[in-house]
């Protein structure tokens, strides 16, 4: 990382896997950001586990690559992995450097190796290079988390340009394909691939027409690839979050007027926080999940998947 930048101040973390996290209730700010958005500028601040997550050595010795690891669910997974004993490489868009620096510092604060890999995954060569660089820097790979995503709300199919549609497809479908394919020679018996799907795969919203299609594809990706790789002992699973307070939502993922009450219609009456999703990724990455493959784990605040 560049030496001329100030290192972030790290908060202390409390004991317990998830110890009384401060979960803000609606209404939230309706402030929007340009894509791709930064967690550090959100109001209220999401809880990625910076203070609330403490591990129990469930991933000791493992090496993980997390795409979209600078903010949101990817950030929470990266923090949790490090606190569970894993070395972690994170990929992020170059415009998210400031968020990424905080995550790198948090990983290193746990005494784990941290690798920063900025790249736009819509470019095939860049996506494949991220995998190669992670394997080289970490000395191998046991866990691949395909989490980076693009979500842009649109009132009508007529409002989605071909370029915008292509950007969503490239980010959410092509990039996981390229990266899983590139990682396969490095993944051995016991390895785990985790892809972030969404409740949108089961119950698509009208304003997320293109995003919902890709999340259904992500679910199918996990189910089909799990069958392919089962003979090699490599597990593949998906996670389907419901409404979670991340930079994805404030950078075009939701309309401005929907942000104050985002997630308030869930039975729990609020959106999820990224730290509340991270334990699913820890489980699926761990040896505890040795008989779990081809599954899609939902966390929707009680709304369910309807599937």
Model-identified regions with their sequence ranges:
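C-terminal substrate-recognition "lid" of short-chain dehydrogenase/reductases
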Residues: 138, 177, 186, 270-299, ...
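Catalytic loop of short-chain dehydrogenase/reductase
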Residues: 149-151, 194-231, 243-244
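A short, exposed helix-loop element centered on a Lys and neighboring polar residues
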Residues: 180-181, 223
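Substrate-binding pocket helix/loop in short-chain dehydrogenase/reductase
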Residues: 155-157, 161-166, 262
């Amino acid at each position: 990382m560049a030496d001329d930048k100030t290192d972030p101040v790290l908060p202390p973390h409390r004991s317990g896997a998830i110890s009384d996290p401060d979960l803000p209730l609606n209404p939230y700010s309706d402030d929007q950001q340009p894509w791709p958005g930064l967690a550090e500028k959100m109001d209220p601040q999401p809880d990625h586990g910076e203070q609330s997550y403490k591990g129990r050595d469930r991933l000791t010795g493992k090496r993980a690559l997390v795409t979209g690891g600078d903010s949101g669910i990817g950030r929470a997974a990266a923090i949790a992995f490090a606190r569970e004993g894993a070395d972690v490489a994170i990929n992020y868009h170059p415009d998210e450097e400031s968020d990424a620096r905080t995550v790198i510092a948090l990983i290193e604060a746990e005494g784990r190796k941290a690798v920063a890999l900025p790249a736009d995954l819509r470019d095939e060569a860049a996506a494949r290079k991220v995998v190669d660089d992670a394997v080289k820097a970490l000395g191998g790979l046991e866990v691949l988390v395909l989490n980076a995503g693009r979500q842009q709300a649109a009132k009508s199919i007529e409002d989605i340009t071909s370029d915008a549609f292509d950007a969503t497809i490239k980010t959410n479908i092509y990039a996981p394909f390229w990266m899983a394919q590139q990682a396969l020679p490095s993944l051995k018996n016991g390895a785990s691939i985790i892809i972030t799907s969404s409740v949108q795969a089961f119950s698509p919203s009208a304003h997320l027409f293109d995003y919902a299609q890709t999340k259904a594809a992500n679910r199918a990706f996990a189910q089909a690839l799990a069958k392919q790789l089962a003979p090699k002992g490599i597990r593949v699973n998906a996670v389907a979050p419901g409404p979670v307070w991340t930079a994805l939502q404030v950078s075009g993922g939701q309309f401005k007027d929907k942000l104050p009450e985002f997630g308030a219609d869930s039975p729990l009456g609020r959106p999820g926080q990224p730290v509340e999703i991270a334990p699913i990724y820890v489980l699926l990455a761990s040896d505890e999940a040795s008989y779990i493959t081809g599954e899609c784990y939902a966390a929707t605040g009680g709304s369910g998947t309807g599937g």
